[in-house]
């Protein structure tokens, strides 16, 4: 019987840690392939264990600023919808005041890890994509509950150097060596293929790299922008 893995992504940390991927592969046109991201690290765990791993759930935790004057949330809303509809993620998004977003993410992520750990047969291995030492108490509890832990970190996240080294060794919260995001940069990079799609509005076919669930041709997008500026 395969081991069940559940992935927990600290969206705030992952956004900041893109700098490590930029440094590895260049900033221009770099995008993360969110559909591949959890699978890449579950496959790595499977290779370490030399047994099958079943990815049962990917949880993404993020925020939307509620107190920033004039801030348009439509782009973030569309991104979170994309994670759910196209990548199969479960998202937990909080409206927060600017400056307190990370605390909400940390509390929600830790609570969710422990909640599912308490459900019989929900998962065997927790894969944490994030590396703040604030997670150490929750990760220790997971191990006491018989769960195994894999930490996915970055060597530089904009604030700290190698924080996960301290997290996994000093606090003894991981069962596996830390996996480094920058070492898997090429694997998690989104490579867009050009395909022909039909416009949802007019039915016209056009070549595009857009992979979202709905596609609108350049003419329809242009007319929409024109009306929006009128």
Map each language-model feature to its residues:
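Domain-level signal for Mg2+-assisted phosphodiester chemistry and nucleotide/NA-binding surfaces
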Residues: 1-103, 144
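Nuclease catalytic cores that cleave nucleic-acid phosphodiester bonds
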Residues: 81-228
